[in-house]
Amino acid sequence: MGKTDKVVVGLSGGVDSAVAAMRLLEAGHHVEGLFMKNWEDDDTLTHCAAEEDLAEAQAVADHLGIRLHRANFAARYREQVFEVCLREYRAGRTPNPDILCNQRIKFRAFLDHALSLGASKVATGHYAGVGEQGGRFTLLRGEDPHKDQSYFLYTLGQAQLRHSLFPLSELPKPEVRRQAAAAGLPNHARRDSTGICFIGERDFRAFLSRYIQRSPGPMETPEGQVVGEHQGLAFYTLGQRRGLGLGGLPDHDEGAWYVADKDMARNALIVVQGHAHPRLLSTALVADELSWVAGAPPTLPLRCTVKSRYRQQDQPCALEAGPSPTSVVVRFDTPQRAVTPGQSVVFYQGRVCLGGGIIQTRTPVE
């Protein structure tokens, strides 16, 4: 692209997107910002986070001398991300709303809006990269292994990547902070946001219970012994330790308790003791709702590495054709802990992200 072409940067109010915009300006691009409102203020129990974020984004835009556009995608977010997640939680699965948000809001609604403003590219503060050869694009891991966010971007295809820039792809987070402070960016010391995007740092169970009715049932061992009561299967995820309320049970001194499974038919939560309990391990999984960055699946079977959750180390595996034409089987070289239906499994070869899919079922260790 020419440096006179317009790039619209998604300014969130955070330091990453601010430095992304600054680096593009320094490279000579025509840069404008866009602040997305994806969650309605009246749906929060505390202060108005969106107003605070907007104020930070505007301060950054003013400091950089760029225009800041605003767009309200809250209705689309509720329908295409939040309601989808609620359905998944009610079905006993654990969705990843950040991946849905990237797919349906940031790289669809935001991208379309930016193009309508005359942009040729959009940019975000994600720690990932885009490669290009012969008019074909690849999604690359960010250079900083501790911040790489390609896991959350695996649904991006050729149409999105051709219009996308990730200016932080080669930077570690401490360097981003250093550049922000050196440039005097007004939000250089703002701490990173954490938690699920629409929940933030609020209590997960309390927030979700506003939308999903509590449905108590038994907590059981695999042998059928009832050891407690859960508040509703939607509020728990596989591998979870905190919030079970099972500490200090008599005749159970084998260690901490973990969620191992959900019996939806009986509304029973299956729990086990010990971080490495065999019931927490899986030898394989089936994934569908597949997305391939190249636009078409690779030839199977295929040796690659995968992540079945964010921040997991790459796990070597065999990728095979699945039980249906739209699914794949992942066979791990080493059994993996807490493989969770509803979460995403993402496929890699070296630095290149091939794509990924949604975990449907897992094969427990025999």
UniProtKB/Swiss-Prot annotation:
Record-given protein name: tRNA-specific 2-thiouridylase MnmA
Provenance organism: Alkalilimnicola ehrlichii (strain ATCC BAA-1101 / DSM 17681 / MLHE-1)
Protein's gene: mnmA
Active site: C101, C197
Region entry Interaction with tRNA, spans: 147-149, 309-310
Keyword set, alphabetical order: ATP-binding, Cytoplasm, Disulfide bond, Nucleotide-binding, RNA-binding, Transferase, tRNA processing, tRNA-binding
Site features described as Interaction with tRNA, chain residue numbers: H126, Q343
Job of this protein: Catalyzes the 2-thiolation of uridine at the wobble position (U34) of tRNA, leading to the formation of s(2)U34.
The EC number(s) this enzyme carries: 2.8.1.13
A GO CC term assigned to this protein in UniProt: cytoplasm
